[in-house]
A protein has these predicted regions:
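Active-site neighborhoods and metal-handling regions in enzymes and metal-associated proteins
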Residues: 1-474
Length: 474
């Protein structure tokens, strides 16, 4: 593919590399951009997306490239263009142009990388991070003698790291947790495009149409404004399936449509969820539950302030949701006791959100090392154990806030989860049955932590019940 200079000026990437070095010390670093992923044979590839750590420090999507350096001295190693690349792929910027735009001293052929590694003290002295793409991971294994297999990631922990790679991971996390002005500008731009997409999806929704028509309307806005989906869009009347990959069903009057769709602009992600009635009007039970989830969203957002532990933000959403379920007669008991026991997780089984940045779940390739602060580990309790983030919030961190209510058969029919609450009368199934038309509701915003009140970056995307209904029925 053709390689183009970054949107930002070189000073952005020079400053980021300096911050990384200040956090790391004078260790040499090598980061891989990664290779395209084939769909079904080598020449037919998915759209290329560079590894986020490389993208953060260079702003450039360059297949197969490697960034190598320390201090203020950095080089990129890449495969020279083939003679016929311009014919098939179009002309790329010259290497001199790219070097100046990225702020590196030189761009050299990839064949010279091995000698450059020796010049930096050898593979053992270099710090690197595991590549995501299999070909790049194989290169790392050969060049750096790292014991990283292709399938050794755990659900939460990613690849185990030793020094000096562990030090690089901690340094990278420290500089990427809070966003600079350039990053925030791109996130805002992505959210503006997401706003257009959600409005287009709402406007197209009506009984008889298919979910995929709404998805197409949303993603058309992404494409029309120079963005791509940041992840696989979820557009489904089966809102109880948390990460539903299918959008083939016809929508019917009485359905709720859950839409979790965000644009990615210049590599930076947005992540927004709205839920709306297909007919343009909530039923009484749908409206009651929608307002409970909305209040949980609002209350949790208000907690996004410097120094607040994100786990406490999650628990605030849980308390608000539980209070609403008690008010509706679905649960019985003391609010705090119910939350401590995890009764709310029967209906809200995931965490309230995650970091947002270049990755929609930012830095999740580094596992809980990124998401959890020092000394913090995941809970073993159902629901709370799925919390992706447990750090103290700081200025210019961007997080999602996404409480929900779901009627998941696999949970509600599981005696190991529901049994204790059934036996002591906490769970009132007869009352719950009245809410059968509420399969799933999620309301998700992207929120910046500031020195004062939280900034809801996605505030323009309608979420009040009447505003949502007005957009669907317009």
């Amino acid at each position: 593919m053709s390689v183009y200079p970054p949107i930002e000026g070189s000073e952005v990437f020079i400053a980021r590399r300096r911050r990384l070095m200040a956090a790391l010390g004078e260790l040499p670093v090598a980061l891989f951009a990664g290779d395209p992923s084939p769909r079904n044979y080598a020449a037919n590839v998915h759209p290329y997306r560079a590894h986020s750590h490389f993208l953060y420090l260079t702003g450039t999507a360059w297949p197969g490239a490697v960034l190598l350096g320390e201090g203020d001295e950095w080089e990129i190693f890449a495969t020279p263009p083939a003679p016929d690349d311009a014919l098939w792929l179009g002309a790329s910027a010259t290497w001199d142009t790219l070097a100046a735009a990225i702020g590196v001293q030189a761009i050299r052929p990839l064949a010279e990388l091995a000698d450059a590694i020796v010049a930096h003290g050898g593979a053992a002295a270099l710090a690197t991070l595991p590549a995501i793409h299999p070909r790049s991971r194989a290169q790392q294994a050969a060049l750096f003698a790292r014991p990283w297999g292709l399938h050794d990631e755990s659900l939460h922990g990613a690849v185990p790291l030793s020094e000096p790679d562990s030090a690089l991971a901690e340094a990278m996390i420290s500089v990427r947790l809070s966003h600079d002005a350039a990053a925030l500008a791109h996130i805002r731009g992505a959210i503006q495009i997401t706003h257009r997409g959600h409005l287009a999806g709402m406007a197209l929704t009506s009984p008889g149409r298919r979910e995929c028509e709404v998805r197409a309307a949303i993603e058309r806005e992404f494409t029309a404004h120079g963005a791509v989906p940041a992840y696989g869009s979820i557009v489904s009347v089966a809102g109880e399936i948390l990460h539903n990959e299918h959008s083939h069903q016809h929508m019917r009057a009485g359905d709720l449509l859950l839409v979790d769709a965000g644009a990615e602009l210049h590599g930076w992600a947005s992540d927004v969820t709205r839920t709306w009635p297909v007919s343009g009007k909530f039923s009484p039970t749908q409206r009651a539950m929608y307002d409970i989830v909305l209040q949980a969203n609002i209350d949790a957002i208000d907690q996004v302030r410097p120094g607040v532990r994100y786990r406490d933000v999650h628990l605030q959403a849980c308390r608000t949701l539980t209070r609403g379920l008690v008010d509706e007669g679905i649960l019985r008991g003391d609010i705090d006791n119910l939350v401590e026991r995890g009764a709310h997780a029967l209906f809200f089984p995931h965490g309230v959100g995650h970091l947002l940045g270049l990755d929609v779940h930012d830095m999740e390739d580094l596992g809980d090392r990124a998401g959890y602060g020092p000394g913090r580990v995941r809970s073993q309790q159902f629901g709370l154990g799925y919390l992706r983030l447990d750090r103290d919030l700081a200025v210019d961190m961007v997080v999602t806030i996404e409480p929900g209510f779901y009627l998941v058969p696999a949970i509600l029919q599981d005696p190991s989860l529901c049994g204790p609450f059934d036996r002591d009368g906490t769970l009132q199934r007869e009352r719950l049955a009245a809410f059968a038309d509420v399969r799933g509701i999620r309301i998700e915003d992207d929120v910046r932590c500031t020195s004062g009140a939280p900034e809801v970056l996605s505030a323009e995307i309608p979420k009040a019940a009447q505003a949502v209904m007005d957009c669907v029925s317009a």
